[in-house]
From Swiss-Prot:
Swiss-Prot/TrEMBL keywords: Ribonucleoprotein, Ribosomal protein, RNA-binding, rRNA-binding, tRNA-binding
Residues spanning the signal sequence: none
Protein name: Large ribosomal subunit protein uL16
CC terms in the record's Gene Ontology section: cytosolic large ribosomal subunit
Species per Swiss-Prot/TrEMBL record: Nitrobacter winogradskyi (strain ATCC 25391 / DSM 10237 / CIP 104748 / NCIMB 11846 / Nb-255)
UniProt record similarity statement: Belongs to the universal ribosomal protein uL16 family.
PROSITE patterns, alphabetized: RIBOSOMAL_L16_1, RIBOSOMAL_L16_2
Recorded name of the encoding gene: rplP
Length: 137
């Protein structure tokens, strides 16, 4: 699973996701992609599950780019612990995704296969997504 090797701070504020994505909103590498349509926090496990679904459906053909990286730690207190006594230990890593952000890109497969693979990957994510394709130039 993806997580940073080193961070400046161990814990992060919860934060809010405002606005729409300005960077990472267009296809940069592949011919087809999966674009987020709503603001959401996506965990490293969800990204990995979607990546596995993609590569398995493509039967290892083509190329996959993951355009998001979980760099925000989410802390959690242990079960049945009273409130107070500080913030819990870092539990998982998430990425804050704004609407319009491209999550995955693929290339080297047929358009029909690409759409099927990205639909399977989208089912693993807690977010409404859209299939996008590069316009033929």
């Amino acid at each position: 699973m993806m997580q940073p090797k080193k961070t400046k701070f161990r814990k992060a504020h919860k934060g809010r996701i405002h606005g729409v994505a300005s960077s990472g909103a267009t296809l940069a590498f592949g011919q087809f992609g999966l674009k987020a349509m709503a603001p959401e926090r996506i965990t490293a496990r969800q990204i990995e599950a979607a990546r596995r679904a993609l590569t398995r459906h493509m039967k290892r053909a083509g190329r996959v780019w993951i355009r998001v990286f979980p760099d925000v730690p989410v802390s959690k207190k242990p079960a049945e612990v009273r409130m107070g006594s500080g913030k819990g230990a870092p539990e998982l890593w998430v990425v804050r995704v704004k609407p319009g952000r491209v999550l995955f890109e693929i290339d080297g497969v047929a358009p029909q296969t690409a759409k099927e693979a990205l639909t399977l990957a989208a089912a693993k994510l807690p977010i409404k997504t859209r299939f996008v394709a590069r316009i033929a130039e």
